Curated annotation (Swiss-Prot):
CDD domains: PNPsynthase. 1-deoxy-D-xylulose 5-phosphate binds at D17, H18, R53, H58, T108. The record marks E159 as: Transition state stabilizer. Keywords: Cytoplasm, Pyridoxine biosynthesis, Transferase. The keyword Zinc does not apply. This is Pyridoxine 5'-phosphate synthase. Signal peptide: none annotated. 3-amino-2-oxopropyl phosphate binds at N15, R26, G200, G221, H222. It catalyses: 3-amino-2-oxopropyl phosphate + 1-deoxy-D-xylulose 5-phosphate = pyridoxine 5'-phosphate + phosphate + 2 H2O + H(+). Catalyzes the complicated ring closure reaction between the two acyclic compounds 1-deoxy-D-xylulose-5-phosphate (DXP) and 3-amino-2-oxopropyl phosphate (1-amino-acetone-3-phosphate or AAP) to form pyridoxine 5'-phosphate (PNP) and inorganic phosphate. The active site is at H51 (proton acceptor), E78 (proton acceptor), H199 (proton donor). One of its GO terms (molecular function) is pyridoxine 5'-phosphate synthase activity.
Amino acid sequence: MIFHASPGVIDLGVNIDHVATLRNARGTTYPDPIAAALLAEEAGADLITLHLREDRRHIKDADVRALRPQLRTRMNLECAVTQEMLDIACDIGPQDVCLVPERRQEVTTEGGLDVVGGFAKVQAACQQLAGAGIRVSLFIDPDPAQIEAAAATGAPVVELHTGRYAEATDDAEVKAELVRIERAVEEGIRWGLRVNAGHGLHYTNVQPIAAMAGIHELNIGHAIVAHAVFAGWQNAVREMKAIMVAARLSATTPAAAHPGVPA
């Protein structure tokens, strides 16, 4: 089986933000995130993810507009719940928009969206995007209250924040976070949601997450960009997709259990 060409097993969303970070570090026109996205598709990416931040620290408006008509898969645009970003998203029309929390001083997204605390605002954003024909995803912590609130907004998709799992430093903590994520997946499914996941996943920690049968899609960026320094961009994408699909397929064999998750 060609792992990087296995649709329907588990989807890989390649995040191109940090290709733009490299470009912007020198104020050049290279490396081109658009070219990176198209090459990622050729290497087996099922979608391209990019985050248009309010401060435009990596992806620029022009990147999103240039990329949208060129993609053969689909665009997953991450953005904050602000009127400016919602209007941009509705104008460009990506297939998916993932609403994320955003603070200017953070290095990367530090936690999930507080749907419970900002319910009315998030619900209104979901309605505006859905009205433009865009599928909405909410990037949330693997918490039952947040999942229930996400379902109540009308969003059809949640992306579970895997950062605490990725940052866990001992076996007990890793196992606890995997259990937390698996229960959140089950809760999301119970509410009729499509469940995705991402944040902090790399080549040696993605396997237990990819093995969880209820997860449809993983969005991974920094690890692939970093690995590409040594392995090459398309090889890095192919390797990640192969690891994910192998983990999922091995988990669906009769004798397999979810790695790291106690029964």
